[in-house]
Regions:
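A short, active-site helix/loop in glycosyltransferases that binds the activated sugar's phosphate group
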Residues: 130-134, 158-205, 212-216
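Conserved donor-binding/catalytic core segment of Leloir-type glycosyltransferases
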Residues: 184, 232-251, 257-260
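Nucleotide-activated donor-binding/catalytic signature segment of Leloir-type glycosyltransferases, i.e.
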Residues: 274-296
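Short alpha-helical donor nucleotide-sugar binding micro-motif in glycosyltransferases
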Residues: 300-305
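Aromatic "clamp/platform" in nucleotide-sugar-dependent glycosyltransferases that forms part
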Residues: 313
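Conserved acidic donor-binding segment of nucleotide-sugar-dependent glycosyltransferases
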Residues: 350-358, 367-372
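A short, well-ordered alpha-helix in the C-terminal region of glycosyltransferases
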Residues: 373-387, 394-397
Length: 408
């Protein structure tokens, strides 16, 4: 059995690491595995190929603002990717996150469909069934064709008249007529949304939770003590916020700033780890650390914290939550599916509250930080659900089932 994954990046960001973990996990299980990716650094690793130049991807990023078509891009990169597909002749193609201006999504889907290649599609975000935006929020235009998109500029970075409706129609056409396609949302909520979309509702769904490297993300007691001393936390409760971008409005950094003002600085300290090194506002009252120096240090931050706080407006299945739980630290989070939490998480260790309710956020953070479960117990609960080993095993089962189905 030969599996070929396609993702925008490799070994970078959440989807890049997931793609890497599946690739290496399959190889360890003696499954023939290949990865094609389009953005960032060129990786020197067996079976991993970069298919698009940064120049072409960036050029089409700009051009797509004029055309309004962010998924009909990069002809040379697309041709390179399709040629590699022909050369590799995989039994199953696994599509991860394929936005990022490195491939023409419609051409890729039509190629897979025309050549009857069994395909697994992981839904990390919403754009594959909205046809446009990564998060639809309260908008329901994606259910009927995006004819009156209220947020087109934010959704596709273009104001071209009718662009959202065109994109939706093209995505629907590209998905029509697949012989063997299975959808793998990363959470039940994403899967439920996909069943409401005319683009994807006709295909079978199997939720596969993301997994992380629990050899890295586990409770690190010694490193935690060293880090708390380094940060001069003392006897205070350490409130951790890990974010890809503190200044991104969707990530809710403003709520962390307000939380830092509400908490007694003699009893609590808010610590921010920010992937983009965006400094918080001047009125932030805590420790802004910036980007962690590698995965091991990030695991030490989770291990050192008394509670991890998530304040995003929308998330599908945030990797930070998986990492925190596997390091033994409970989570306080706004509902990241509107008015819903995520049933995939062990309820005992993840505490959801209504978005924007600062009184309840403050009270819950205080309570959890002072009465949290023993670290090792929380860590073990996380490992049972979110380890990369479990994720790879689940995907292997799906590959085999899909391949058998296609040959019957």
């Amino acid at each position: 059995m030969k599996i070929l994954q396609i993702n925008c990046v490799y070994d970078y960001g959440s989807t890049g690491k997931i793609t890497r973990d599946i690739h290496r996990g399959l190889q360890n299980n003696r499954v023939d595995s290949t990865v094609l990716y389009g953005r960032r650094q060129k990786v020197q690793e067996a079976g991993v190929y970069k298919t698009c130049t940064e120049f072409e991807a960036k050029a089409w990023n700009v051009l797509s603002r004029l055309t309004g078509r962010p998924y009909a891009v990069t002809p040379f990169g697309t041709l390179t990717l399709l040629h590699r597909l022909e050369r590799e002749k995989p039994d199953v193609v696994h599509l991860q996150c394929i936005n990022g201006y490195f491939v023409d999504i419609y051409r890729l889907l039509n190629y897979l469909k025309k050549n009857h290649i069994p395909t697994v599609l992981t839904l990390h975000a919403e754009f594959m069934y909205t046809g446009n935006c990564g998060h639809a929020f309260e908008c329901n235009e994606w259910k009927t064709g995006c004819h009156n998109c209220p947020n087109q500029k934010e959704a596709i970075n273009s104001t071209r008249n009718g662009a959202a409706a065109w994109n939706w129609k093209k995505m629907k056409e590209a998905f029509e007529g697949f012989d063997d396609l299975i959808l793998c949302p990363v959470s039940d909520w994403v899967g439920e949304r996909a069943t409401q979309s005319p683009v994807l509702k006709q295909y079978p769904i199997r939720t596969v939770l993301n997994g992380i490297d629990t050899d890295i993300f586990h409770y690190r007691e010694k490193e935690a003590l060293v880090l708390r001393e380094k940060l001069n936390v003392g006897d205070r409760k350490m409130i951790l916020h890990v974010t890809a971008s503190y200044t991104d409005p969707v990530k809710g950094g403003k709520f962390i700033t307000e939380l830092s003002q509400r908490l007694d600085s003699e009893k609590y300290v808010v610590v921010v780890v920010d992937g983009l090194n965006n400094p918080p506002p001047k009125d932030f009252c805590g420790i802004y650390y910036g980007r962690a120096n590698g995965q091991e240090e990030l695991a030490a931050f989770y291990s050192a914290a008394d509670v991890m706080v998530l304040t995003s407006y929308r998330e599908c299945l945030p990797t930070t939550c998986l990492e925190s739980l596997c390091c033994g630290t409970e989570i306080v989070s706004f509902y990241f599916h509107g008015d819903e939490g995520e049933g995939s998480f062990p309820e005992k260790y993840v505490h959801f509250i209504p978005h924007g309710d600062m009184e309840q956020l403050t009270d819950t953070v205080k309570n959890v930080s002072e009465h949290h479960e023993e670290k090792k117990i929380c860590c073990e609960a996380g490992r049972k659900i979110f380890s990369q080993k479990v994720m790879v095993e689940n995907y292997e089962k799906i590959y085999k089932k899909l391949l058998k189905q296609s040959t019957d």
